[in-house]
A protein has these predicted regions:
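HhH-family (HhH-GPD) DNA N-glycosylase catalytic core used in base-excision repair
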Residues: 2-308
Length: 308
């Protein structure tokens, strides 16, 4: 559609056709406060397409793949204690998806109780600690695989290509993350020449085929009845999902007992402490957080991502 014939848009770039707005209370399952800015900027993968994050205005714009078609929504700070959600077209399923992405179903009260007694992490109890997740586990797994053994620019290139070429399109022209079926239908040439995924191409296609054909239930990894060891074992069995990707995915699945120790976290910890530290020393520092040790470690590393 030519720009001259496109439906008018509001100040946020959303089509004015059948626009709507709603609010969700910014409160965790235990009644604890939620810091929206720290949630939408909680990790780098959160800013990959189709997400667009503006920390200056505390805004997340994203396009969701819903049963009745893709829809673009804008999530921003509303009145005190609430988050404002704006969209165009169908509203069904959007609030549930946003609640899921912001982890408003999680209770971090136990973590905050320990953090409050830790001088270096007391600040986190004001609402930090919710790692923005994708609408589906499949999307998070694909994005995580695209972060392995490459520069960040390559990760952005790969995920952008997947969304731009395979994602379902919303009325405003933006695209959601592709479905397993769409990724399974793409051939090897697409992954090699368009996505330029390298060795990951075969892994991504195989993963999508297994999910699409019902051989693999990635969404089942979100089952809280599974132990951390069971989830880790299933993740490690996925094509392209080694120890690093598994540790990263465990965090995105809300399983924080393990620390993500990699080429970024180790030197960042050393910089903040003023000296290098062995992995066992780092693990000892956060042992008191028990099931939240990995989350405490991550927040320690990323405190300066948001100005106090």
């Amino acid at each position: 559609m030519f720009a001259g014939n496109a439906p008018p848009r509001n100040a946020f770039g959303l089509s004015m056709a059948r626009t709507w707005s709603a609010e969700l209370e910014l409160k965790g399952a235990g009644g604890e406060a939620v810091d929206l800015l720290r949630t939408i900027t909680s990790h780098g993968v959160a800013d990959l397409p189709p997400n667009d994050i503006d920390p200056d205005t505390v805004t997340l714009t994203t396009t969701l793949a819903l049963p009745r078609g893709a829809a673009t929504v804008r999530v921003s700070a509303g009145r005190r204690g609430f988050v404002r959600i704006e969209g165009a077209g169908r509203k069904a399923g959007v609030l549930e998806a946003v609640r899921h992405m912001l982890r408003l179903d999680a209770d971090l009260s136990a973590f905050y109780a320990v953090a409050t007694a830790d001088p270096e992490l007391t600040w986190a109890a004001a609402g930090a600690g919710r790692l923005l997740r994708s609408p589906t586990v499949f999307e998070d797994v694909v994005k995580t695989i695209c972060t392995t053994n490459c520069a960040w620019s390559a990760t952005v290139r790969m995920t952008t290509a997947l969304v731009d070429h395979l994602g379902p399109q919303a009325p405003d022209g933006r695209r959601a993350f592709p479905t397993p079926a769409a990724m399974a239908e793409a051939d090897e040439t697409f992954y090699r020449d368009v996505v330029r995924a390298g060795y990951r191409g075969a892994y991504l296609r195989s993963l999508a085929e297994d999910v699409d054909e019902g051989r693999l239930d990635l969404e089942g990894l979100d089952d809280r009845e599974l132990s951390d060891d069971e989830v880790a074992e299933r993740l490690l069995a996925l094509p392209g999902c080694g120890p690093y990707a598994t540790a990263h995915m465990m965090m995105l699945l809300g399983r924080y007992s393990r620390l993500v120790l990699d080429s970024w976290t180790r030197p960042t910890y050393a910089r903040l402490r003023g000296r290098k530290a062995a992995d066992r020393t780092i693990e000892r520092r956060f042992r008191g957080y028990r099931d939240y040790a990995g989350l405490a470690f991550w927040l320690y590393l990323t405190r300066d991502w948001v100005e106090s």
